[in-house]
UniProtKB/Swiss-Prot annotation:
<dbReference type="Pfam" id="PF00032">
    <property type="entry name" value="Cytochrom_B_C"/>
</dbReference>
<dbReference type="InterPro" id="IPR048259">
    <property type="entry name" value="Cytochrome_b_N_euk/bac"/>
</dbReference>
<keyword id="KW-0408">Iron</keyword>
<dbReference type="InterPro" id="IPR027387">
    <property type="entry name" value="Cytb/b6-like_sf"/>
</dbReference>
<feature type="transmembrane region" description="Helical">
    <location>
        <begin position="33"/>
        <end position="53"/>
    </location>
</feature>
<keyword id="KW-0830">Ubiquinone</keyword>
<feature type="binding site" description="axial binding residue">
    <location>
        <position position="196"/>
    </location>
    <ligand>
        <name>heme b b566</name>
    </ligand>
</feature>
<dbReference type="GO" id="GO:0006122">
    <property type="term" value="P:mitochondrial electron transport, ubiquinol to cytochrome c"/>
</dbReference>
<feature type="transmembrane region" description="Helical">
    <location>
        <begin position="288"/>
        <end position="308"/>
    </location>
</feature>
<feature type="transmembrane region" description="Helical">
    <location>
        <begin position="178"/>
        <end position="198"/>
    </location>
</feature>
<dbReference type="GO" id="GO:0046872">
    <property type="term" value="F:metal ion binding"/>
</dbReference>
<keyword id="KW-0249">Electron transport</keyword>
<dbReference type="Pfam" id="PF00033">
    <property type="entry name" value="Cytochrome_B"/>
</dbReference>
<dbReference type="InterPro" id="IPR030689">
    <property type="entry name" value="Cytochrome_b"/>
</dbReference>
<keyword id="KW-0999">Mitochondrion inner membrane</keyword>
<keyword id="KW-1133">Transmembrane helix</keyword>
<feature type="transmembrane region" description="Helical">
    <location>
        <begin position="320"/>
        <end position="340"/>
    </location>
</feature>
Length: 379
């Protein structure tokens, strides 16, 4: 009798994806983040589901319902802070996962990469809408500022914004629809993740050398299941430390003030994981230009495979490209810092220089450096 693991139509899919999957023998800890992202998504869906049981998406009661969850629901505060800080862990893993892909040339699997970029946009949209739900000051003004950016679109902009708001300002209708979409999107993301994995398993994983590893594969289980579990424990340790000791460290104190359309907070800023894009948006004095730069700051990832000029796939043996990669990382950290600062000298000029450097590095300097490396190797 054949093994049920290999014969049952459903279990066979799990087997081919997580047990008997051939994986390169040399993939490092940077390949752990895919599974961690899966865990983050599952955690967000579960905690979000329980939070939705107690939350009310009405402007009059939304803020109170979140307070009620924290004060009166059994372990409601744990659910709330797991969900909020779980989003931060999600984005940390996302950015490290994308960074790994950039460094090791994983973007050469174009279908998987493009699916990943779509996933990134979907997760960012979900996180933005989730931030609006507690209906604090930063929720309200963040929603107002970011949705207002769409009014920069010529001709249809104003109508589009009012259509999204469901009125002439961010109000009851906006909150209700944001809750509906915030609930729906994670399930769409789950489906997209399956497509992402489908494309990945067509080609197999990349590895740190960037050289095909077809002749040296090992089964995913037990080697990488154990390795992933170690990464999982480390992530859970960080997440629980955040939730138990300083749950509000990554949040904004303004969001503990109920939304008030008549009082604008001194500094409107999004959650930390959007600050780099927010800094790029603010560094351009023109509204439409800023919106385009904001979208392009993420959309630029789509063009990375076409900007790959090196004869080698990975950066492992390319010291010039490595230096530029870490320059880009430092630049993104600088933008993240600037995004959280007020719009005044010297932050404005630092943000503008960092924004120029970001696009220049990706579009011009890195492709030229790759060509130079080819030349140095006489390729």
């Amino acid at each position: 009798m054949x093994n049920i693991r290999k014969s049952h139509p459903l279990i066979k899919i799990v087997n081919d994806s997580f047990i008997d999957l051939p994986a390169p023998s040399n993939i490092s800890a940077w390949w752990n983040f895919g599974s961690l992202l899966g865990v983050c998504l599952a955690l967000q869906i579960v905690t979000g589901l329980f939070l939705a049981m107690h939350y009310t998406s009405d402007t009059a009661t939304a803020f109170s319902s979140v307070t009620h969850i924290c004060r009166d629901v059994n372990h409601g505060w744990v659910l709330r802070y797991l969900h909020a800080n779980g989003a931060s862990m999600f984005f940390i893993c996302l950015y490290l996962h994308v960074g790994r892909g950039l460094y090791y040339g994983s973007y050469m699997f174009k279908e998987t990469w493009n699916m990943g970029v779509i996933l990134l946009f979907a997760v960012m949209a979900t996180a933005f809408m989730g931030y609006v739900l507690p209906w604090g000051q930063m929720s309200f003004w963040g929603a107002t500022v970011i949705t207002n950016l769409l009014s920069a679109i010529p001709y249809i902009g104003t109508d589009l914004v009012e259509w999204i708001w469901g009125g002439f300002s961010v109000d009851k209708a906006t909150l209700t629809r944001f809750f509906a979409f915030h609930f729906l999107l994670p399930f769409i993301i789950s489906a997209l993740v399956m497509v992402h994995l489908l494309f990945l398993h067509e080609t197999g994983s990349n590895n740190p050398t960037g050289i095909p590893s077809n002749m040296d594969m090992i089964p995913f289980h037990p080697y990488y299941t154990i390795k992933d579990i170690l990464g999982l424990f480390m992530m859970i340790l960080v997440l629980l430390s955040l939730v138990m000791f300083s749950p509000d460290m990554l949040g904004d104190p303004d969001n503990y003030t109920p939304a008030n359309p008549l009082s604008t907070p001194p500094h409107i800023k999004p959650e930390w994981y959007f600050l780099f894009a927010y800094a790029i948006l603010r560094s351009i004095p023109n509204k439409l230009g800023g919106v385009l730069a904001l979208v392009l700051s993420i959309l630029i990832l789509i063009f990375i495979p076409f900007l790959h000029t090196s004869k080698q796939r990975s950066m492992t043996f390319r010291p010039i490209s490595q230096c530029l990669f870490w320059l880009l990382t430092a630049d993104l950290l600088t933008l993240t810092w600037i995004g959280g600062q007020p719009v005044e000298h010297p932050y404005v000029i630092i943000g503008q220089l960092a924004s120029i450097l970001y696009f220049l590095t990706i579009l011009v300097i890195m492709p030229l450096a790759s060509l130079a490396e080819n030349h140095l190797l006489k390729w």
